[in-house]
């Protein structure tokens, strides 16, 4: 049953990370999806934490943020960790430049802490990580897919059907690859330049509209939603470079629902 399937999955490479036993994924079946969900909620909640004036609510937001950050750390999702940096960058650019000092903590943590989290993060640059190698191979195949059908693509949701014809790496017909582990390449491959441009325009338009809300003269609540929505779009834009998290229906539903909530709160 479902419990047995969840117990059997660990999402780790025991040869590359022998001390890493399990990655948290909750009911989302994949740690990267849980990481994407966490950064979306962190984005919105951070905005409300910063703008909240009532002490009790601020403490409540702080506790929930701490739990979410701990959860994000335990996913061991490097893409999600990098998207957290995008949230900090967004706060630096659009809220308070002093948040930029948080980036100076990264080398300090890497220097003094040598646990599994640091080892997993640094493996991005080692050239020996299997998941990184797989992604480069998938991107090479996806680029070939785009070059062959640049305008209209292979068809919406048909990546897994087209991939075997461009399989340069796995060479196993029983392994299904559902997406390119890169939202940008995946959209271009499935719906071509025309459809891909339309999708990406719609995606980044959410961030632009949220920015307009945040910089506008609406209520404090609406401007806070605007800031949170802007941070969320920046975070998903970054994590989508190494995974196609919006392929997951639960994550996609959450993202577009939160986008609708943020954008719809404005008096356009």
Describe the function of each predicted region.
Residues 208-222:
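Alpha-helical transmembrane segments
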Residues 28-31, 75-79, 177-182, 243-254:
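Membrane-interface catalytic loops of GT-C/OST-like multi-pass glycosylation enzymes that act
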